[in-house]
Amino acid sequence: MAGFLDNFRWPECECIDWSERRNAVASVVAGILFFTGWWIMIDAAVVYPKPEQLNHAFHTCGVFSTLAFFMINAVSNAQVRGDSYESGCLGRTGARVWLFIGFMLMFGSLIASMWILFGAYVTQNTDVYPGLAVFFQNALIFFSTLIYKFGRTEELWT
């Protein structure tokens, strides 16, 4: 059962060459996910304007996710491998530490949004939509970060 789908291939569309458009498609998909995450949170803030319904401190999860998005994508894969980043104040180790801190912020924001969802909304007798908005905002920013970081190729720039 381990090699069940080893020889399975999806039928390829011959009319579009995806290898040339991989960076554009990954960037557009990541941008749509990032925009949708913030749009859901802004919608929840408009629908539930009172702090009793949606605490304004819950926006910090999305802010830290956005900060982590920029931190993670500021470091190229070549810098992490050490191919193109030999000089500088910290070099390859600094790039890896920066990327690690970015992923810690991203996972921390995602976990905090789940905590907000269950701690402030699911266990209480209130509307769950603001908690879902906080969670989906962070989840969509998380997936957009992964797509933007690992969905693009860097060979075109060298």
Swiss-Prot record:
Membrane-crossing residue ranges in chain numbering: 28-48, 56-76, 98-118, 128-148
GO cellular component, one term: endoplasmic reticulum membrane
An individual GO BP term: late endosome to vacuole transport via multivesicular body sorting pathway
Modified residues (N-acetylalanine): 2
SS bonds (residue pairs): none
Record has Ribonucleoprotein as a keyword: no
Topological category with respect to the lipid bilayer: Multi-pass membrane protein
Keyword set, alphabetical order: Acetylation, Endoplasmic reticulum, Golgi apparatus, Membrane, Transmembrane, Transmembrane helix
Record's subcellular location: Endoplasmic reticulum membrane; Golgi apparatus membrane
InterPro entries xref list: UPF0220
Subunit structure: May form homotrimers or homodimers.
Stated family: Belongs to the UPF0220 family.
Name of the protein in question: Transmembrane protein 50B
